[in-house]
């Protein structure tokens, strides 16, 4: 024992020696790489053993010998780069620009600390297959004027989430515009000029709100870059835009709020009216609009040094000023179609009649006919057509028009023919005068008949619905009158019946009693929510039928609730919860108590809403909640199975979650008896919650906002998979008759700043709360903890303060977590996401779909148990086209606050 005790003090010394030996070995590896480079590039003139003393080589402080910077810029060096260069794993800057280096660029995948990479102006012949892999700290990448073979921007660039500048002009980049760049939300400077890019700008580029300089000009491919340039409207920090010499189409978007100084779009195919949001930019110093197909008034810019907009456009006048009323009207019509290029080629000048614009026929200098059939038009029909008082014939058939036929077109005094056949118009056909022949078949109108108005037209689809004379109208009129009378009588009978029932049921519902009169059983029924909505609930569920179902023990709970037309009386709920016994209480919330119930051998959760808090709006709020919840079906949202109303009573039946709440697993371990969650389990739960909220925000038929997202509203099943609950007081994002315009809902600590101060509700309110939950999952702390010192009570504040120091932050992490090196790396990524989600300004927070994509890569990497390959097949198999497109729209997303926070690995502003 004594001998062993004497040996113990030697252990730390031995470990120290081993660490020192490892450091020496790594330093030796760096030295070997530098010597290899000296041999490959003799002109460097490096000689000796002290590589840290070589010109252009910088080593870390302390004499460990690790090379941190290699600056060989503009030295006219020739030679090749050795493969051993990849062993410089501590390198933060590799600057090789302005030389004549040849051969292949070696793999750089091990340089996880590399922040600056400059390859410009060399003669490299190829890039490594793993180019940009592993460069998670990269901030500046410049590789202009390289004679490489054609290559696409690799998807691995998405890992460079801190990338500030990507400059690769004249670098042989080919293929469609790389949509992966939309994930680089820290990107401020993007220069891809003089390459071979094709296709349009992905809509996802609108997420690049930090962009200051965008240069895509002079693509050399035959097709060039094309399509609209709408994405630049969201780039509010943009100062320089060069997209000249491409094939972009459509109008200039609204540029209000931007900071543009240089705007060069010459030599494209842009159309439309130059917007006042561009001409009124006080920051603008240089503008070039030449050789497009701009229309309307000539723009009047303030005095700026560089201005070029005259040549090659179709402005109505040679000097700034308004166009003629007729020209203005037709340009408004073109605006509805998105200013199509085929029209813009001839719709120029200030006189549509001389020479006549394509599709325009004039009589006495006024438009009498418009024929734009088969012009591949999309967009909407403009109400401005009503200003053409001499218009007799309007043919917009066989296009792709959407929206409705404007009612105002019925006021056209000279109109005789309206042909909108074979489009995608919706709504109803307005009621035109009998003299108007309307051709509207082949659309998506609510009625099977595609026409209205017109008398005696030869086309079988253009007949008047009310102008036919003779005996046919009288039987139809009699039939209609009979139906109306019958409906009135029916409603009168229903009203009397309801009044009679209300008088019989004046006594308040007593949930503690299992004895219910037949009349009460009829009124106090649970209505069943199936996959297609709420059942009509016209009659109570017979007790004998319920008993029959109870006997069928093989049926599961979903079959019990989703059988067609199935309804359960309130007796079932009373029995299931033992008269709402205290022993069955699962939890209490601001709007009521949740009980555990047993239906047909299956557990459910019955929420009994507090009648005192529902107030006079209780019925409206309750029905709105049902209307919302019946439309929401998702794997990670707690499903509503049914509901019951009587007087002030509100009862909701949900699926039962046996794993408790996330709060119990994070902050109430002693009371709940749960063991701490592992990091893998926490990541999986975080992804589940994100997917549920993502569905509410953008994949459901309507956009829903939770407004009270917190750990106690996140329920877990037996496998610790999460579902979001208690979104019954959700406020529909778009106002409807059943939107809940109530007080601010939510829990202090999880409220976004703008919501707490102004009550303004957007989806970013939920994103903020989600970020707070991520912080709780990382730290194991409550969002507000009065037991801590005053400067540490608010989790968000202390979290954002500690995240700036990686070592300090490590002590801030939940001590119950056992993290490997890989686990620590993933935790830092989640912490970074939490920081962005809780940004003060809503526009700085990511959308939930981007949170899903960022977490998905981490969860897939860890491959936690109980995640099947087809885990989400159930929610997508019935997903409509709208939801699928919205789902596919979302790419990986990170965001950078422009104020204070940098990345974990390298400074935000690199000084090199």
UniProtKB/Swiss-Prot annotation:
Task: Establish whether keyword Transmembrane is in the entry.
Answer: yes
Q: Which residues are glycosylated?
A: 159, 170, 196, 256, 286, 371, 376, 387, 400
- Topology within the bilayer: Single-pass type I membrane protein
Q: Which residues form a coiled coil?
A: none
User: Which parts of the chain does the record assign to the membrane side Extracellular?
Assistant: 28-477
Question: Which tissues show it?
Answer: Expressed in young and mature leaves.
Enzyme superclass (EC): transferase
Q: Where is the active site?
A: 708 (proton acceptor)
Q: Is Nucleotide-binding one of the keywords UniProt gives this record?
A: yes
Q: Where does ATP bind?
A: 586-594, 607
Cytoplasmic face: residue ranges?
Answer: 499-912
Cofactor(s) the protein needs: Mn(2+)
Q: Where in the cell is it found?
A: Cell membrane
Which cellular component terms (GO) are annotated to the entry? plasma membrane
| Reported effect, residue 396 to P | Water-soaked spot leaves which gradually become withered. Reduced plant height, length of panicle and seed-setting rate
Where are the residues of the annotated region Disordered?
448-472
Family (UniProt): Belongs to the protein kinase superfamily. Ser/Thr protein kinase family.
Question: What's the stated role of this polypeptide?
Answer: Transmembrane kinase receptor involved in the regulation of reactive oxygen species (ROS) homeostasis, chloroplast development and leaf senescence.
> What's the protein name?
Receptor protein kinase WSS1
